[in-house]
Amino acid sequence: MPVHDDHCNPNPAPLYLGLMSGTSIDGIDAALVRINANPITHCELIAAQTSAWDPNLRTTLLELSQGQNTASLDQLGWLDAQVGLAFATAANTLIAKTGIKHTQIRAIGSHGQTIRHRPHGDLPFTWQLGDAHRIAELTGITTVADFRRRDVAAGGQGAPLMPAFHLAILGSANENRAVLNLGGIANLTLIPMTGPVLGFDTGPANALLDSWYQRHHHETFDQSGNFAASGKINQKLLACLLDDPWFTLPPPKSTGREQFHLDWMTKQLEPTPPSPADVQATLLELTAVTVADALLRQQPKTTRLLICGGGAHNPVLMARLATHLPNVTVESIQTYGLNPDYLEAMGFAWLAAQTLDGQPSNLPSVTGARGLRLLGAIHPA
């Protein structure tokens, strides 16, 4: 995937590289993008790839993020360094495949790996591992990271952070739109023709679906939703899951594996539980129902729902969303020439550009922060 130099353009739009690993911890997404100068309204994906986690490191991160394990200070320091090394390796691997020089990339935007997200309480916090100093050192590229904590310090949820990016590249003056990221957790961005943008998590998505599937199969996820399609929705289990008070919380709200993990679901199983396929079908329906309910409640006149994330490749989930939203066009962002697997990584490249240009990138209407804030810490090359 060589990238040609801009011989005809002495001032090409700068290149940025975004790095992202979500709540599923199923890989490190790296996206190389070319971003227009301010106002930033267009991002061109130049190259992208997903790097696999070391299996033992992934297991440790999953256990830590789900509250199933505690770690000593030494272990946390080691994990921070390991995640930073893994992110730097993912960046360098992609750069090597493109044939461009590291010096052609203005900055890396790194999300890191969330191990705890506690946006409520007397002293809320969010914590992402991935030593950005190490990323900058090993790549030789200025790295912007730690995007969420400034918003939390300003009274916000620190999530979701993609709505400003979604608005910039997918907003429309002609129809009310929504963007749905179906990653480990499902989150919505509501983009009305006029008025403030809203964004919030709606509940679990691939985090539960993948975990349950992996318990019963050797593969990592339910390819094309076939396992869910082979089962039947268990209405009693679905009602028990929907009874969780988190679902009735109003936005702004965000969540993670510490809230919605496999133990949370298995506690609801009856003494004679449904078949594994029926549970998978029910978990898929949980995602579809909670997304549809949230969308209809918060933006009932939505015309179009654009899907990104791994769930965009699950035709069964896409069909259930369409069933629950009969008056909404439900489609993948691929329709608009965007890769659904790398939109978040592109978004963190965009956040890095915003920060280096001195532009705030949180939306108080989304996170609940006291105002616009410049996000992230800059680690020079």
From Swiss-Prot:
Class of the enzyme per the UniProt entry, highest EC level: transferase
List of residues binding ATP: 22-29
Listed HAMAP family: AnhMurNAc_kinase (MF_01270)
Family designation: Belongs to the anhydro-N-acetylmuramic acid kinase family.
Function: Catalyzes the specific phosphorylation of 1,6-anhydro-N-acetylmuramic acid (anhMurNAc) with the simultaneous cleavage of the 1,6-anhydro ring, generating MurNAc-6-P. Is required for the utilization of anhMurNAc either imported from the medium or derived from its own cell wall murein, and thus plays a role in cell wall recycling.
Keywords per UniProt: ATP-binding, Carbohydrate metabolism, Kinase, Nucleotide-binding, Transferase
Source organism, top-level taxon: Bacteria
GO BP terms in the entry: 1,6-anhydro-N-acetyl-beta-muramic acid catabolic process; amino sugar metabolic process; peptidoglycan turnover
NCBIfam families: PRK09585.1-3, PRK09585.3-2
One MF term in the entry's GO annotations: phosphotransferase activity, alcohol group as acceptor
InterPro entries recorded: Anhydro_N_Ac-Mur_kinase, ATPase_NBD
Annotated protein name in UniProt: Anhydro-N-acetylmuramic acid kinase
Organism the protein comes from: Xylella fastidiosa (strain Temecula1 / ATCC 700964)
Name of the gene: anmK
Reaction catalysed by this enzyme: 1,6-anhydro-N-acetyl-beta-muramate + ATP + H2O = N-acetyl-D-muramate 6-phosphate + ADP + H(+)
Pfam families noted in UniProt: AnmK
EC number: 2.7.1.170
Biological pathway: Amino-sugar metabolism; 1,6-anhydro-N-acetylmuramate degradation; Cell wall biogenesis; peptidoglycan recycling
